[in-house]
Each structure stands twice: as structure tokens, then as C-alpha cells.
């Protein structure tokens, strides 16, 4: 009887422990989901600007398809206007995430996001790394030349928002009272990003080199490798790290140079263009179809709002190949 009682007691304790563990996991999962949903809403602020910028660039390329603005001042103006947004997408992410993730959506958080991004991209730029390591700029890891990406922008925004939520109401001594409250946030963000930069100094080259090495290995798989490349290209777009993978196939990193050979007509039929052709069905038909599906599944009261955003994103994808507005829409938000 004592043995049966002991086993039953132990089993009951284990059962209770399992229930508590499952409850803890579910609570953590719920917190994480709410955090990611808030991050998604924050990202939609900068993402909303992208379709207009993409359309401006698309019109410019349509006016001057061969010279890309070199043969038409109007085309050059439109391409430059749109490129000002697209080329600085990571800065928009830093500001938008910092503002959206702050507790009261104050402009000081947005300023802190900009400060965070400027600090990390300056400290980890090729020139600064060359000075810190006492080597020539040409000898610096190429990863530091790609530090201004969306992934770094999101990290900068999250750090800035965290600093704002923590220090925006801190009051310093009377002698330093001018720097109290919200004025303290950009200062603390700068110090925090120095530490983040120190960590990224060691981690970022490994991440970037790993992506390049991965691209090099799958390039040896022929057509199957092209499919794998396309899959991971789409997967990495929300972080901006797809540029590391693209550099392996599109340019002359490992003697593939897909874009260069295609435009120079010096490639091999059936091989050259392999790492570009698969994008056209997705950009011209797949994503616009996804936009239509999201519009139809949106709630009736939100169809007009969703329709405006999705139409601009679909046009951007079809005509210009800029797919981020569409992809960020369904990665971070539900259709409704």
C-alpha cells in the first residue's frame, strides 16, 4: 500500500509539474506572439512608404529602360526620388520600429532609433573597422560593407525603444536635470549601441560569411541549387540579408556573375539567367495574386484600407520587381 501510495504521489507531482511547465510555455508563447504582432504593426509605418517609392522608380525605368536615367532627366529624377526611400529602407525601419515599440509613441523614441542606427553603422563601417584593426580598408571583411541592412535597422529600433521605455521618465540630479527624461534616451541609446556594435563586430562577419558559403555550396547543384537559392532569397528578404546571398549568384564573387554575363551576352544558354528567371513568375503573378487573395479575405470594414495598400504593392511588384511592400504586408500582418 505504501509503495502504491508513493508511486501515485510521485506521478501526481510529475503530472502537476508537466501542467505547470506547459502553462509556462503557453504564457511565454502568448507574450512572444504579442511582441511579434506589435513589431509587425511598427514595421507597417515605414513599409507604407515603399510602394510609392517603387512606383516612382518603375515609371523612371519605363521612360528610360536602357539608360536607367542616363538618357532622360525626368527618368533620372523619378528614379532618384524613389531610390532615396528604397536605398535607405533600413533607416526607416530603425525609426519606425523605435516609434512603434515605444510605450507612448513619442518622437524621442524615433530620434533614438535614428541615433542607434547611425552609431552602429558608423562603428561597423569599413573605414572604422580598418582603423580599429590597423589594416587597410581593402583587407577588411566584406561583411562590414553590408552593415546598413534592414536587420540592423530593426535591431537599432528595438534597442532604442527599450531604452525609451526604461529611461524616458528617469530624473537626474539637479546639476544634470537638463538631460533628464526624454533627453536622456538618445544618450543611453548611444551607449547601448556601442555595446551592441561590440557584439556584432564578432558575430556579423560570421553570419555574412555563412550566407556566402551557403550560396557557394548550393551553386554547385545546378538547377536544383537555383531553386534552393530562390527559396532562401525569399526567406531572407524580411531581414535584408538576402543581399549577401544575391552577391554570390548575381555578381562575380565566385565566377557566376549571372547579371553581368546576361547583359553582356557572354553567358551560356540554359545556365546564364538561371538565378534571375525564377523571380519573374513570383513578382509578376504570384505576389499580385496574393494581394488579390488578401483583399478578398479582409474584413468588409477594412477592404478599402487593405485595397489601397495591396494595390500599390501589387503594382510595385509587377512593374518594378520591388516586392518588399507586399511581402512585409503578409509576413507581419494578417489580411484582416
Enumerate the language-model features and the residues they cover.
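Short, Lys/Arg-enriched N-terminal segments with co-localized hydrophobic residues
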Residues: 2-6, 13-31
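Early transmembrane hairpin of solute transport permeases
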Residues: 33-174, 178-180, 333-336
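Membrane-interfacial loop-to-helix junctions in multi-pass transporters
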Residues: 83-89, 146-151, 181-187, 218-228, ...
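Alpha-helical membrane segments and immediately flanking helix-loop junctions
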Residues: 89, 266-268, 275-335
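Aromatic-rich transmembrane-lumenal/periplasmic boundary elements in polytopic membrane proteins
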Residues: 197, 204-254
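Interfacial juxtamembrane loops and adjacent helix segments
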Residues: 245, 249-278
Amino acid at each position: 500500500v505504501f509503495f502504491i501510495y508513493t508511486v501515485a504521489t510521485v506521478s501526481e507531482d510529475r503530472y502537476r509539474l508537466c501542467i505547470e511547465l506547459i502553462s509556462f510555455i503557453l504564457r511565454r508563447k502568448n507574450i512572444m506572439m504579442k511582441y511579434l504582432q506589435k513589431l509587425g504593426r511598427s514595421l507597417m509605418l515605414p513599409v507604407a512608404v515603399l510602394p510609392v517609392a517603387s512606383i516612382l522608380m518603375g515609371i523612371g525605368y519605363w521612360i528610360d529602360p536602357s539608360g536607367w536615367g542616363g538618357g532622360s532627366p525626368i527618368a533620372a529624377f523619378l528614379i532618384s526620388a524613389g531610390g532615396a526611400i528604397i536605398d535607405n529602407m533600413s533607416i526607416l525601419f530603425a525609426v519606425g520600429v523605435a516609434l512603434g515599440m515605444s510605450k507612448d509613441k513619442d518622437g524621442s523614441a524615433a530620434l533614438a532609433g535614428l541615433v542607434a542606427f547611425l552609431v552602429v553603422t558608423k562603428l561597423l563601417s569599413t573605414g572604422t573597422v580598418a582603423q580599429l584593426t590597423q589594416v587597410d580598408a581593402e583587407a577588411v571583411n566584406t561583411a562590414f560593407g553590408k552593415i546598413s541592412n534592414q536587420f540592423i535597422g530593426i535591431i537599432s529600433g528595438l534597442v532604442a525603444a527599450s531604452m525609451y521605455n526604461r529611461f524616458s521618465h528617469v530624473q537626474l540630479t539637479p546639476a544634470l536635470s537638463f538631460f533628464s527624461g526624454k533627453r536622456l534616451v538618445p544618450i543611453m541609446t548611444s551607449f547601448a549601441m556601442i555595446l551592441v556594435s561590440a557584439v556584432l563586430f564578432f558575430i556579423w562577419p560570421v553570419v555574412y560569411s555563412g550566407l556566402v558559403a551557403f550560396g557557394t555550396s548550393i551553386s554547385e547543384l545546378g538547377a536544383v541549387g537555383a531553386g534552393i537559392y530562390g527559396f532562401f532569397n525569399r526567406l531572407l528578404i524580411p531581414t535584408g540579408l538576402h543581399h549577401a546571398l544575391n552577391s554570390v549568384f548575381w555578381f562575380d564573387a565566385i565566377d557566376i556573375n549571372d547579371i553581368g554575363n546576361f547583359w553582356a551576352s557572354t553567358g551560356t544558354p540554359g545556365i546564364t539567367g538561371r538565378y534571375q528567371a525564377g523571380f519573374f513568375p513570383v513578382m509578376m503573378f504570384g505576389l499580385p495574386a496574393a494581394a488579390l487573395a488578401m483583399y478578398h479575405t479582409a474584413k468588409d470594414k477594412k477592404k478599402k484600407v487593405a485595397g489601397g495598400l495591396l494595390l500599390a504593392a501589387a503594382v510595385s511588384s509587377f512593374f518594378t520587381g520591388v516586392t518588399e511592400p507586399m511581402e512585409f504586408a503578409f509576413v507581419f500582418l494578417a489580411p484582416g
